[in-house]
Amino acid sequence: MKLKSIMSQCQFIIGATSIKSLPDFSIPEVALAGRSNVGKSSLINAITNNRKNARISSKPGCTRQINFYLINKGLMVLVDLPGYGYSKADRATVNSYICLMEYYLLNRKNLSKVVLLIDAKVGFKEIDLDFIRWLEVHQILYQLVLTKIDRVQSNVLDVIVSDIQNFNLNFIIYPIINVSSKCKQGIEELIYEIAQCIKK
């Protein structure tokens, strides 16, 4: 099966707002995580080649639920997690979806890995490192993706990658992928890495 065709059929299933509303799948899941406004929705639309699949907002913290997308009629599930960091939502709402996200990550047996997005324009921040440390503590596999690379020079990307590699990380999956949803750069490589969960 060609890489692009793997993600070509994408169907939104549900936006879970509580533990009880989390759907029960037995097929592999790959979750997208990252800071608020890191570009998760744009990336979903880029890898599925459909601008209408995920709603894009310029306001940070727009995603306040866990969105599930069925890929290729049941080949796998792509999961869009709420962004961490700044949000215009009240504290109770933020705490609610953070707890939901933590529950999902800790209890999802069919979760193959987390694709953690880092905004290349903003850089690698302490809040990103905190999330990585949390994943490490709980032994959750993750792969890093630098987004919006069309907005920065290549030497900036090198610095970010170098900073990340300075840490002793045991559950990271390499390579670190550079992508631009706008220019479609790195999208095919990312699809390939996501599709590895199907082969397991």
UniProtKB/Swiss-Prot annotation:
Annotated positions binding Mg(2+): S41, T63
EngB-type G domain ranges (all copies): 26-200
GO biological process: division septum assembly
Cofactor(s) it depends on: Mg(2+)
InterPro entries membership: G_ENGB_dom, GTP-bd, GTP-bd_ribosome_bio_YsxC, P-loop_NTPase
Transmembrane segments: none
GO MF terms, alphabetically ordered: GTP binding; metal ion binding
Residues that bind GTP: 34-41, 61-65, 80-83, 147-150, 179-181
Keyword annotations of the record: Cell cycle, Cell division, GTP-binding, Magnesium, Metal-binding, Nucleotide-binding, Septation
Listed Pfam families: MMR_HSR1
Function: Necessary for normal cell division and for the maintenance of normal septation.
Family, as annotated: Belongs to the TRAFAC class TrmE-Era-EngA-EngB-Septin-like GTPase superfamily. EngB GTPase family.
The protein, known as: Probable GTP-binding protein EngB
Gene: engB
